[in-house]
Amino acid sequence: MSKDNRLASILLQPVASSSGNCTEFHDSKLHTLQEELNFLPLEGVASNVCPPMFRGHKNYVFVLYCLNQVDLVTNLQDSTKRYYPLQIFKDCQLSSLVQKDFSHYFQLSRQKEGEDRNDSDTTLVNVVNSGVSRHRSQLLKMCIIPRICSFDKSNSKTYKLIQEYVNRFETVLTKFGPEKDFTKVYANWSKLIESFNELILHDLLVKWQQWSELTQPNATVHQNIPNVLRELVIKLTQRYFTFQPSYSCSIDEFTTILLNKNALSLLDVFRKPRKYKLNFGLWLDCQNGILIFTNGIVQMADEITSERVKSFVRPAHLLVLEDHSNDEAVKKLMFFTFSAILQCFTDEILNC
């Protein structure tokens, strides 16, 4: 697991040295960031999510929305002026004061009227009845690479490697998709995802340590990155993410895996002020070439009752691979995987 720490090397400027200043800075930047995101019709999406108890889970609603109604791309050039790549670290530092919101961690943009659309970028399979107009949805696009991984593109080895992973995932589909050999698609994708997860977690860890040293100059924040990386990779696979094939895991067994991950999160819900816990599962039907995106959710009700904490597994999206472009399938796969990594990192980094 040893990696060159320069892989994630970035130039960070100190923002605040005290919790008070950090909170003030956070509130100011978050307000401006929220103005940027006001065009997102998430309230309209949430109002149609069933069952209603999930409508307050911002990250779940955001994942549904992006998988089903947003143009997913690998690069955005037109919204760099309001670009806060370190928002995720600020939220982690203030974990007891803020609710982490995925919409702050990805770069979104309005698509201008009349702008040429690349059909390969379209991800408008609407399995969620959101009630948002198709026209309005088509005017939104999002970069699947989180802000924290893409803000130093010209110098970032990690960013270049992410683009290589996009090509590798597509190459697998190009090679085995026409033959409908989805068993080999799974075998290759599974290996790619494993190394991809480690790459992104390592990148986040190096940047997190640099950020912590700048914002907490009087604290001891040095971490043994290989050890912490190993711990996060284990937690990611145990609690937050799974990718299973139909030939060794039935859909019922897949559901059980996600419910078991929910069970591991129950103590966290009781221990910390969180109303929801989220995990991510991919299931590939290797006979028919169908990729199912699914979330496991633990929800704590406000009312104190014997059924206060509930565990659910909910489908988020479905793709028949041969009916969609390789580009579209890979972008959705990678966005979903990125979301699982961010969920793991933001939940666990302060415990490492």
From Swiss-Prot:
The lineage of its organism: Eukaryota, Fungi, Dikarya, Ascomycota, Saccharomycotina. The keyword Transmembrane helix does not apply. It is found in: Nucleus; Chromosome, Telomere. Disulfide bonds: none annotated. GO terms for molecular function: telomeric DNA binding. Keywords: Chromosome, Meiosis, Nucleus, Telomere. GO terms for cellular component: chromosome, telomeric region; meiotic spindle pole body; nucleus. This is Non-disjunction protein 1. The keyword Nucleotide-binding does not apply. Its main location: nucleus.
